Amino acid sequence: MVAFYKSFSAYIQSITRWELLTFLFILLMIFCFIKRDLSSHIEGFEQSDKYKVYENDSIYDSFYADIYDELFIQPNKIEAEVDEIINITGVLNNSDNKNKNFKIGDLGCGRGHHVHELTKKGALNVVGCDKSNAMLQNARDLYPKCKFIQGDFMKPMLFSEEEFNVLTCFYFTVYYVKDKRAFLRNCYQWLKPEGYLILHLVDRNHFDPVVPGGKPLFIVTPQKFAKERITNSLVKFRSFQYKSDFTAPPPSSAKTGEKNVGKFVEKLIDDKTGKVRENIHTYYMPTNREMLDIAKEVGFTITGQVDLVHVLNEYQYLFILKKVA
């Protein structure tokens, strides 16, 4: 699948602008029919208030868990990330994997897709951790043979010292964490010597904040053809409309706004009642350099970086942090 996306991306770059626009128009029509069919089973949200606001942890209830994949999941990206974990850590060739002593933990596992993919490809001791009971219930329903626990990874006692060979933190999870130093210190404590933390980070000023569900088949980013960065998304479900907008942290020279704090705001509007559910995600987004400097101060060595452009996620990266013995 990853190889297909590489080849397809090369093909897209080779055709003329008019050919590309025609191709995208056809794909958009196909996408609209597919999306309408895929989202037909999603029921509308129910609330007594005309306008209700959810923030951070409270957002991840059963309704949001049910629509999450429609908005955010990219199977090719998950597969690519798991392949990178396997290649970097050598888990499948490690003798400890056979007796389940090679342990991988996915922090902020959500609906459990990475845990499942790792298990499917041969990692025998993988556990997913998330704070949201609703997301974990979805994960357990989807993947009953995988292991999941509910917990807050900001609590040092959640896991034992030197329990894991590998920890992962994907898809903006780290940006919900205000105290990055405490988070990295916990990870360092839980890792065995020579263990890895694989961390998803983005270039906050250039990554594409349009949700995957709002892009036709994930073929090409509209940012390439926009004069200004597109920050808003629109997805139509059967009985409600989804809108989102991302506001990047202000520049360091700005006189207003909180340093390193961005906002991702979602609005879900019921077609019949007009009631609105607003989700406010607060992202604590230091620059990648600032983040990696903190990691070094905690004790990590930065051993590598994977650019996710090959799965059409430009300006998004996996950084490989190692606890050197």
Model-derived regions: residue spans:
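Short, low-complexity, Lys/Arg-enriched N-terminal segments of secretory-pathway carbohydrate enzymes
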Residues: M1-I12
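Conserved class I S-adenosyl-L-methionine
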Residues: L20, F25-K98, H113
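Class I SAM-dependent methyltransferase SAM/SAH-binding core
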Residues: G105, R111-P156
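A short SAM/SAH-binding and catalytic strip from SAM-dependent methyltransferases
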Residues: N165-D179
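A short glycine-rich, Lys/Arg-flanked "PGG" loop and its adjoining helix->strand segment in the class I
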Residues: R181-Y196
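SAM-dependent methyltransferase
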Residues: L199-L292
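C-terminal lobe and adjacent flexible extensions of AdoMet/dcAdoMet transferase-like proteins
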Residues: Y284-A325
